Regions:
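Nucleic-acid endonuclease domains
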Residues: 1-37, 42-146
Length: 146
């Protein structure tokens, strides 16, 4: 309909830029959270959001994730439906606290390079605040933030 191929998917940096514009934030320099005040995750609607921690920086990354709020962007396969949710760090901290001993144990094995966990779409909907919703290509909801 709009003249673009839907082969492949929108990259993570594109979702980070979209989110930065939406919440008036900036990219964070170096490793850690994606934006100064937010970690950005994206998935198709109904799917879980993956958190991945690499061996060399995993512990620092998990600590950084505890210190920021989290934005979750979901989309349909056609990109005609998009939801953006904000989950405050206080609601995420118990999850990260649960993952911490698992992360440490994971890296006791010398061959382990990554530690992956996920947050469910249901958790995001139950604990989050909806910031934006596009349905059928039409803006249906936008929460003005100050």
């Amino acid at each position: 309909q709009y003249g673009f191929s839907l082969q492949g998917s929108v990259g993570s940096k594109d979702w980070e830029v979209f989110t930065a514009i939406l919440v008036n934030d900036r990219a964070r320099r170096g490793d850690g959270a994606d934006l100064v005040n937010y970690e950005v995750k994206f998935a198709t609607i109904g799917s879980s959001f993956e958190y991945q921690y690499h061996r060399n920086r995993g512990l620092n990354k998990l600590t950084d994730d505890r210190d920021v709020d989290h934005i979750f962007v979901t989309r349909s396969e056609t990109y005609m439906n998009v939801e953006v949710w904000l989950v405050e760090r206080t609601k995420m901290i118990p999850i990260f606290d649960r993952w911490l001993p698992e992360l440490i144990q994971n890296y006791e094995a010398a061959d382990r390079q990554r530690f992956r966990r996920s947050v469910t779409y249901g958790f995001v909907r139950n604990q989050g605040v909806r910031l934006l919703e596009i349905t059928g290509g039409e803006l249906r909801y936008f929460l003005e933030t100050t």
